[in-house]
Amino acid sequence: METCRKAPERREALRAEAAEPRSENMAEVILKNIKKVYPNSEPKKRSKDSGEKKHNLQITDEGVVAVQEFNLDIADREFIVLVGPSGCGKSTTLRMVAGLEEISAGELYIDGKLMNDVAPKDRDIAMVFQNYALYPHMTVYENMAFSLKLKKVSKDEIDRKVREAAEILDITQYLDRKPKALSGGQRQRVAIGRAIVREPQVFLMDEPLSNLDAKLRNQMRAEIIKLRQRIDTTFIYVTHDQTEAMTLGDRIVVMKDGFIQQIGTPQQVFDTPSNLFVAGFIGTPQMNFFDARLQKAENGDYYVTVQGVDFGLAPDKQQLLRDKNAAPQDITLGVRPEHIMLCAEDASESHIKAKVDVSEMMGSSIHLHVNADGKDVVLVLATVDLPQEHRLGFRFGDTVNFAFGGNVMHLFDAEGKNMLY
C-alpha cells in the first residue's frame, strides 16, 4: 500500500520537474520566404489544356508548387498550429522544418542557425507521426529507448529518461508490452514518449490524432495540452481539424493552396477572419454567407441591405469603414450561426423571414436549418433561451423570423477580403 500511495506523488513530482524551464531545449524557429516545388516528373505537353493549368496557382513551369511565400517567426516555447484542408502544404512545411523535404527556396533558422543543409539527425528536433511509426517487434521500453541507444547514451541515463517520460504519460504499466497489445491512444502516447526522451529543441507533430476515434481524440487533445505545460518547449503541430487548432495553439496559421491565409491567436482568427476562406473554414457550423449591398446614408452612416432588409452596423465597424472611405458596393455578408437570433412574428426591428427545413436537437442547443428566399441558413440556438414550445425542436415548414446585430457582421469585398480586417 505504501508503494500505491507514493506512485502518484512520484508522477506529480516528475511532471513538476518536467515543467521547469529548460533553456537549453528552447528554440526560436524562423521560416523566411520558404518555397517548395516538386519538379514535373514528365515533360510538359503543349496541348489545348495547357491554358487551363495556368488557372491553378500551384502548377507552374517549374513544377507543382506545394508551399510558397511562407514567412513565420515562432518564439521560444510557443505552440504553433498549421491548419488547412488536404493539399494546402501544411505537412510539407513541417517536413521541411524536420529536414525530410528539401527547401526549394528561402531560409530556415532554428535557434539562430541556418538549417537548410543540416541533416535531420543534427537539427535537434523530434517528430510524432500520424501512424505512430513504432517498431512492432520491440517493446514499449525498447521503442522509447531506441534513439538514445543510437546516440550511445549510457544505460542508466536511458533507463532514467524512459521511465520519467513513461510516468509523465502514464504508460509505465505498458513498458514491457509490444505495440500490437496497445490501444490507439496508448500507441500514440508511446510515440510521444519516444520524442520526449530525446529532449529536443523543437517538437513536430504531423496530424498525430487523425487515426483515433472521436472520444480518444478528445482525450489525447487534453493530454497534449497537459504535455505542453509540462515539457515547456517549442511545438509545431499540423492538423486539418480546426477544433484541434483552436484548442491547442497559442497562434494558428491557416493555409490554402500553399499560401498562408492568416496568422493569429485562435480568438483573433475566429473574431476577425482575413478573408472568405478563413471565415468559412474556422468555426462549426461554418459561417453563413449572404449576397448583400453596403450602403451609405446621407448622414454618413453605413448599413447593409440583405434580401431587401436593412441592417445597421455597430459604431466601431462604422468607424473602420469611414477610415477606409469605403464606397457603396456589392459585398458578401458573413454571420456565424450562433450570432443569429430569432425574432417574434410582430417584431418591429429588421428581420428576415424563413421556413424551417431541419431541426437538429443537440441537447444544450438546436441547430436550425432554414430557407430564406432560396438561401440556406443555419442558426445555433441555446435551448435555455428558447420558449418552452421550441425546446424540443421546430417542425418542418414552420415560419420563423431571424435577425443579427450590427456588431456580429463580417463584410467581404468582391475579392473575398474582409473589409474590416
Segments from the language model and where they lie:
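Pre-Walker A (P-loop) beta-loop-beta motif of ABC nucleotide-binding domains
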Residues: 70-81
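The feature captures the beta-strand-to-loop junction immediately N-terminal to the Walker
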Residues: 83-85
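Helix-to-loop junction immediately C-terminal to a conserved catalytic motif
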Residues: 98
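Conserved coupling/switch loops of ABC nucleotide-binding domains, chiefly the family-specific signature
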Residues: 104-107, 157, 257, 409
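Conserved ABC transporter NBD signature motif
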Residues: 106-114
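ABC ATPase nucleotide-binding domains
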Residues: 120-281
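Non-catalytic connector elements of ABC transporters
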Residues: 287, 296-421
